[in-house]
């Protein structure tokens, strides 16, 4: 049986699942958290005298220190652990990006108004870091452990909203990719080799799959 695949789709999938792409996400999240913690230190050193008269949810020094910042730091720790695993070649840890995407819900439950009187440029830079980290995390989450429609990659990139304005510099000519029909993964089987796979039943589906030496990881569920 003859197999072919669009080189732009493969190239983008290689980029989205790469260590460098994950590292960009991790670095921006780290910059966000460091910036946020510095802003919080400025805030707690200039607390208003009537802070304790405010409703408890508005006492940001307690709410953010004991809940928000703690949760964000725990997320950073898990990202760092995944980063170390991915660096050794275990790309099943890409799925930790869901941690960042879940931060939005937690952040939405706490008021950010304590930042209102802090340096505007520093506050903006802080949230810019977060926005970039989220954009990378979203693309990675849409790459693993799931799949892309080839048309999304070939036709819609980079304009579609799903790519969050992450516009990679594409090469003038793409590498030559060849499909190895001898490497096959069936549903609920362990992935034996990390790489990019095409679906035999749906040729418009392309997927990055990751192998792992750890038990229970790298299982393909279709």
How should each PLM-predicted stretch be described?
Residues 3-193, 198-200, 209, 215-216:
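Long, low-complexity, charged/polar intrinsically disordered regions
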Residues 204, 210-212, 218-222:
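Non-catalytic accessory regions
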């Amino acid at each position: 049986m003859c197999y072919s695949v669009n080189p732009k789709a493969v190239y983008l999938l290689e980029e989205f699942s790469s260590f460098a792409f994950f590292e960009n996400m991790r670095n921006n999240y780290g910059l966000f958290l460091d910036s946020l913690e510095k802003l919080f230190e400025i805030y707690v050193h200039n607390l208003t005298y009537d802070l304790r008269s405010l409703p408890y949810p508005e006492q940001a020094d307690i709410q953010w220190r004991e809940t928000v910042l703690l949760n964000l730091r725990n997320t950073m720790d898990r990202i760092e652990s995944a980063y170390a695993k991915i660096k050794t070649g275990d790309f099943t840890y890409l799925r930790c990006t869901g941690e960042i995407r879940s931060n939005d819900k937690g952040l939405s439950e706490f008021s950010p108004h304590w930042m209102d009187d802090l340096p505007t440029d520093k506050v903006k830079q802080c949230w810019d870091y977060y926005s970039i980290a989220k954009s990378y995390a979203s693309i990675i989450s849409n790459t693993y452990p799931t799949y892309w429609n080839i048309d999304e990659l070939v036709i819609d990139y980079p304009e579609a909203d799903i790519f969050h304005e992450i516009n990679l510099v594409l090469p003038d000519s793409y590498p030559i990719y060849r499909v190895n029909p001898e490497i096959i993964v069936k549903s609920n089987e362990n992935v034996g080799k990390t790489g990019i796979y095409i679906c035999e039943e749906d040729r418009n589906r392309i997927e990055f799959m990751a192998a792992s030496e750890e038990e229970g990881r790298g299982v393909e569920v279709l």
